[in-house]
UniProtKB/Swiss-Prot annotation:
This is Ribosome-inactivating protein alpha-trichosanthin. The active site is at E183. Its EC number is 3.2.2.22. It holds the Pfam family RIP. Residues 271-289 form a propeptide. Abortion-inducing protein. Inhibits HIV-1 infection and replication. GO terms for molecular function: rRNA N-glycosylase activity; toxin activity. Coiled coil: none annotated. InterPro entries: Ribosome-inact_prot_sf (IPR036041), Ribosome_inactivat_1/2 (IPR017989), Ribosome_inactivat_prot (IPR001574), Ribosome_inactivat_prot_CS (IPR017988), Ribosome_inactivat_prot_sub1 (IPR016138), Ribosome_inactivat_prot_sub2 (IPR016139). Keywords: Antiviral protein, Hydrolase, Plant defense, Protein synthesis inhibitor, Signal, Toxin. It catalyses: Endohydrolysis of the N-glycosidic bond at one specific adenosine on the 28S rRNA. Belongs to the ribosome-inactivating protein family. Type 1 RIP subfamily.
């Protein structure tokens, strides 16, 4: 009888400690610190299969079959309310999310495909009235990214908005979600800027927006440089932390050696190039990516 009880407890313990889906990543805002946020982003990067490394930067896979193409991120706000976010592991692109028994997917072909594999047991499926393209989200929100606060308190508010699905502020919340997960995984600078705001918010700098808009271009040029003696075929212009334009021409630049943390595979670039606005306003003028 005692042996049976011990065996039963052991089985129960194994069941409870086994993650529901291999590769899932979780982050709780209650008690969160800069360090715990950094661990979360590190775990997210590790959950993304890579083809190989170029200049010590993981090159994401160009494709994966079926459900292997997707991973889940579980985010819990200060009120202990959780949403599960589905991402495409080939580009860290968010497909949709689930709150309770309802799933929400972007209005685009890639998200429709993802819905065949994730959140299939949700009792209700909602197609959002926009795609995950920043330009579409900014239009729906009625504001640009530069005017939407980031930081862990902002992430908490975004989770709450999405958990209860407030249609009026969902687009803004989704931009906070994208930048706090996908963009932070792509760039160490964005991870650090968000992670150090544990108890306050901030407006994203032009440097952050510049990096977000240039991930595809940087990824492409770094891949070209790997067979071109470290030189870019076409320069990439960024805005640095001092709001100055800088031209990146080779892999010795700081953005390559100590910032970009993931590379988009060149085979996936046509789709990603449609996902960011090609012209971003800076001050009184305009800066074309």
């Amino acid at each position: 009888m005692i042996r049976f009880l011990v065996l039963s407890l052991l089985i129960l313990t194994l069941f409870l400690t086994t993650p529901a889906v291999e590769g899932d990543v979780s982050f709780r805002l209650s008690g969160a610190t800069s360090s715990s946020y950094g661990v979360f982003i590190s775990n997210l990067r590790k959950a993304l299969p890579n083809e190989r490394k170029l200049y010590d930067i993981p090159l994401l896979r160009s494709s994966l079959p079926g459900s292997q193409r997707y991973a889940l991120i579980h985010l819990t706000n200060y009120a202990d309310e959780t949403i599960s976010v589905a991402i495409d592991v080939t580009n860290v692109y968010i497909m949709g999310y689930r709150a309770g028994d309802t799933s929400y997917f972007f209005n685009e072909a890639s998200a429709t495909e993802a819905a065949k594999y994730v959140f299939k047991d949700a009792m209700r499926k909602v197609t959002l009235p926009y795609s995950g393209n920043y330009e579409r989200l900014q239009t729906a929100a009625g504001k640009i990214r530069e005017n939407i606060p980031l930081g862990l308190p902002a992430l908490d508010s975004a989770i709450t908005t999405l958990f209860y699905y407030n249609a009026n502020s969902a687009a803004s919340a989704l931009m906070v979600l994208i930048q706090s997960t996908s963009e932070a995984a792509r760039y160490k600078f964005i991870e650090q800027q968000i992670g150090k705001r544990v108890d306050k918010t901030f407006l994203p700098s032009l440097a952050i927006i510049s990096l977000e808009n240039s991930w595809s271009a940087l990824s492409k040029q770094i891949q070209i440089a790997s067979t071109n003696n470290g030189q870019f075929e076409s320069p990439v212009v960024l805005i640095n932390a001092q709001n100055q334009r800088v031209t990146i021409t080779n892999v010795d630049a700081g953005v390559v050696t100590s910032n970009i943390a993931l590379l988009l595979n060149r085979n996936n670039m046509a789709a990603m190039d449609d996902d960011v606005p090609m012209t971003q306003s800076f001050g009184c003028g305009s800066y074309a990516i």
